[in-house]
Amino acid sequence: MAIVVNKPLPEFEANATGGIKVSNVSHLGQILILYFYPKDNTPGCTTEAMQFRDKFKDFEKAGAVVFGVSRDNMKSHDDFKAKLELPFELIADTEEKMCHMFGVVKNKIMYGKKVKGIERSTFLVGPDGLLAQEWRGLKVPGHVDEVLKSVKALKSGKKLAPAKEAADKPAKETPVQEAA
């Protein structure tokens, strides 16, 4: 089942650092931010994590809970979290269940070879459990500030405009299809 803005998230459950279990209903009543990134300890992903870290108190003040999601294992996440002193948890989606559910697994060309990669994307879920906004294929600079702005608007009851990155960027990569 695909995720759709203004609809509830499909059922899921995942493990995060700190022994936390995250599901489609675990954070009802709170604003939930799920940001998907390709890999721990890579330049863009490190910058993005530090930007979420640096704005964490602002997100918390606005009633939002932040989770980073990647295919890395729990040990990699624990090390990455400790190294960057991240105040939020990281979800280890080693089997790519969430990545496929959210449609962030894409075919990419690296060094002339076709590989499966994660498209940097963020999903904002309202306190009612409905997907409020999504950003796909985003660029790191300025993104965290845009998410925070949307969180504050959502908290105040304002209608959210479509995300710039999602609306303005044509899809260049195709989703990877799972075998039946």
Briefly describe each language-model feature range.
Residues M1-A180:
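Chalcogenol-based redox active-site neighborhoods
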